[in-house]
Amino acid sequence: MATEAPVNIAPPECSTVVSTAVDSLIWQPNSLNMHMIRPKSAKGRTRPSLQKSQGVEVCAHHIPSPPPAIPYELPSSQKPGACAPKSPNQGASDEIPELQQQVPTGASSSLNKYPVLPSINRKNLEEEAVETVAKKASSLQLSSIRALYQDETGTMKTSEEDSRARACAVERKFIVRTKKQGSSRAGNLEEPSDQEPRLLLAVRSPTGQRFVRHFRPTDDLQTIVAVAEQKNKTSYRHCSIETMEVPRRRFSDLTKSLQECRIPHKSVLGISLEDGEGWP
């Protein structure tokens, strides 16, 4: 009689291998927060097929799909069925060299060719315009003031020159007249004789002194002044002679003769100065 050997039903190895493979494919960014609890296996019990399908669905649900525009190659060590993606930082670092290769180097150099200009404010432009206008106005004022000053100085110079010329002409005339009068004084200061025609005249000086003397009708008024200076021992410059008769007459031109001035016999004449001093 054959004896029955004890049959040990061992758990299938395939299920354990599949479960470990599924657990390795699950992307766990944080092992503390996202930890999948595997069901405990018992000896002599086979795991249901539902567990395997759930693990695959969880893996497909949690794995983000890679961007379609940028293909990438898997490393040779990784299995083609693995669903663990690369980190986003690593993908961005892989994309940067490719973008740098696509962008030409001439563009960046052309942008940095010229330095950045400072910003131009409108206030600065207005202030500069105001300053330029003020400078132009001040320069115009200075030029006009200089022109006026030059004109005034020119007119003053011309007026001074004219006045000097006039004064020189007057002095020359006076010198010539005094020379002529001096020559006439030297020859006619003597009193005329009884045989000559003569006029008796009384002469009063500016100081009030009087003298009586005979003069010729041809004697001029300067001779009368010279005789008065000789008698009073003084000099009378810029003087004139007036008559005491009414109406009074005044003679400033001393070159005229007594006959020309129509001075009669026994007349009273007074010498007055042009500066206001004279007989009362």
Curated annotation (Swiss-Prot):
The molecular function terms of the Gene Ontology recorded here are: ubiquitin binding
Instruction: Print the keywords alphabetically.
Output: Cell projection, Cilium, Cilium biogenesis/degradation, Phosphoprotein
Q: What is the effect of changing V246A?
A: Reduced interaction with VCP
Listed GO cellular component terms?
Answer: cilium; endoplasmic reticulum
**Which compartment or compartments is the protein found in?**
Cell projection, Cilium
PTM-bearing positions, type Phosphoserine? S87
From the UniProt entry, list the residue stretches annotated as the region Disordered: 41-94
Q: Per the UniProt entry, what are the Gene Ontology biological process annotations, in alphabetical order?
A: cilium assembly; ERAD pathway
Give the consequence of mutating P247A: Reduced interaction with VCP
Outcome after substituting M244A: Reduced interaction with VCP
* InterPro entries attached to this UniProt entry: Ubiquitin-like_domsf, UBX_dom
So what does mutating R248A actually do?
Reduced interaction with VCP
Residues annotated as domain UBX? 194-271
Q: Which CDD domains match?
A: UBX_UBXN10 (cd17076)
- SMART domains documented for this protein: UBX
The family this protein is said to belong to: Belongs to the UBXN10 family.
Query: What function does this protein fulfil?
Result: VCP/p97-binding protein required for ciliogenesis. Acts as a tethering factor that facilitates recruitment of VCP/p97 to the intraflagellar transport complex B (IFT-B) in cilia. UBX domain-containing proteins act as tethering factors for VCP/p97 and may specify substrate specificity of VCP/p97.
On subunit structure and binding partners, the annotation says:
Interacts with CLUAP1; the interaction is direct and mediates interaction with the intraflagellar transport complex B (IFT-B). Interacts with VCP; the interaction is direct.
**In its UniProt entry, what is this protein called?**
UBX domain-containing protein 10
Tell me the classification of the organism that encodes this protein. Eukaryota, Metazoa, Chordata, Craniata, Vertebrata
